[in-house]
């Protein structure tokens, strides 16, 4: 019998699913007492090189309110050619194509190893991929030049039949015609006036005029060229023209007086991009890619005025309700994001500037549409250039690692209901028998739209057990969930990926040990963290921390072993032992602590946390620390100030940053140049080892992390010192028998103090 850890890992590799609980409490009452909700992390398009898609359509349950897809959990009568749906128990006839099936000749979707299967839909014409570049021209010359080169490079990575468009903006917004041979022609819009989709389409001539009725000569072509073709052209037709056009882009000619910001019409430019695609390619996979080098300063969506002496809003301003433009700007971008999502398009934001660019107000554009958010200091850095290049990376079949216009549908057996989802999605408001009245995240529906996703995009799906306490589930009963993802593949095919999973029900009174052993503390920590971050968007920070603390105390009271009022007796089993320290680091993370971060930075961190898979999410919550020394090979060490020793090099991965830190002695040796002396070859290798490992992480991660090389006493050592558990501070540095390590100058409590308080509260009868 495989251990639960192996079972959890196998299921994640096969189905891209991690549940908080892998044995489910069999009644509503008991499930609410478990504290951590029954939920899962789902990676709908997890890469499976061993899973070739099947070239036929799925078989659906005939009950109109169910329509679940045939799967290995269904009961099959091979002689009568009938199958019983495992969700609603409807008996269904197999279609004629299945006439030859038998116990020894099963279709793939009935084999247990195909609990996840992908179908290629043959119906309907394939749709081309569409990329609409929206480019800020209020950049410094070297920044604009670097951006132009990156955009020209990206053209060579696109498939030849992809459609491409270009909008540029500064004080005015220009929509460039790409069909003119050798003539640059563009439509110019004022950057201060918002336009409706209808007005944009009328002005660009996208509404088809009535065709004049006249006899056609046989030689005349019967089809008029598409009205959209002036603005969106296949790359193979306009590759040279567009490369030249990008090369000729000039900085916005409008003069910027001293002490002023450039007039930047980001809100109108995005509005025109959304309106253009809305009128030409609704419900077709498309990416709007916004490149901006500063905050919107005029028109709808402006987040700050053009006076440089008035700084852009900070968290302090927001708390004091002193952010003048925030609410109106946020409303503008939310309206655009919802329109974009309704059309199945996604919006990426690439914001590179030293100051804030308005990501707080614009975050809903990528968050609701599944687009990317990239934040950097300049377009002329390897961080931006390599991150942008990785968007166009290919999979093992040579296809882009991106999918478009997806809908995710969740079906459950009758003892369960869907409470909601947290991730880069919007609700499709599909009510049904499996939709819970209690919402967690984006709820009130069993279907969500994810307009842009890749093989790592991960959603948190939350459930509610609705089975009543007095209606026991028979011994050995299993609950089932089916995830159905319809999407446009980057090869332009329509595909459906179906994942069907089941877990055992257990009676809490008699089988609590089984339920405990099947707790996945890593998945539970990430799922609870997602709930906390989701709440932090609308609630006060301290309230969210109090809520997380309360849940942790309740969980320890439920599953800890202890004697009342005796903290020393408190113990947690192995399947729960790491959970409190995940919560400790989560409380200190930039997702919940806004101190020392700008509103844009907080939005950026939260954006990535809401879409990454379990492994990356855990790194974000609790960074990984590796130690390099002469005492042995590199090894992971505790994220603790006691790990910072003079004769060590540390490598810390926080997901957003890779920090290499040289201990005091190592830094002195390096300054003395020992690594250049032949007799100290081993020291040279020691210095090189973390650089090689860091390079490996930098090559694989999206977005590319910020790379920081520092040493004891260096100003950037703060990145490491702010993350480690402050077990040694200026308060207890000289305690008797204290281990050597770096003292942290902080008033934050250490993990030890946090755990002592937790034990005290968990065992007290007052709680």
Swiss-Prot record:
Pfam families recorded: Gelsolin (PF00626), Sec23_BS (PF08033), Sec23_helical (PF04815), Sec23_trunk (PF04811), zf-Sec23_Sec24 (PF04810)
UniProt GO MF annotations: GTPase activator activity; zinc ion binding
Modified residues (N-acetylalanine): 2
Localization, UniProt: Cytoplasmic vesicle, COPII-coated vesicle membrane; Endoplasmic reticulum membrane; Cytoplasm, Cytosol
InterPro entries: ADF-H/Gelsolin-like_dom_sf (IPR029006), Gelsolin-like_dom (IPR007123), Gelsolin-like_dom_sf (IPR036180), Sec23 (IPR037364), Sec23/24_helical_dom (IPR006900), Sec23/24_helical_dom_sf (IPR036175), Sec23/24_trunk_dom (IPR006896), Sec23_24_beta_S (IPR012990)
Residues the record lists as N6-acetyllysine modifications: 564
CDD domains: Sec23-like, Sec23_C
Lipid bilayer topology: Peripheral membrane protein
Disulfide bonds: none
Function description: Component of the coat protein complex II (COPII) which promotes the formation of transport vesicles from the endoplasmic reticulum (ER). The coat has two main functions, the physical deformation of the endoplasmic reticulum membrane into vesicles and the selection of cargo molecules for their transport to the Golgi complex.
Membership in a protein family: Belongs to the SEC23/SEC24 family. SEC23 subfamily.
Subunit structure: COPII is composed of at least five proteins: the Sec23/24 complex, the Sec13/31 complex and Sar1. Interacts with SAR1A.
Name of this protein: Protein transport protein Sec23B
Chain's gene name: SEC23B
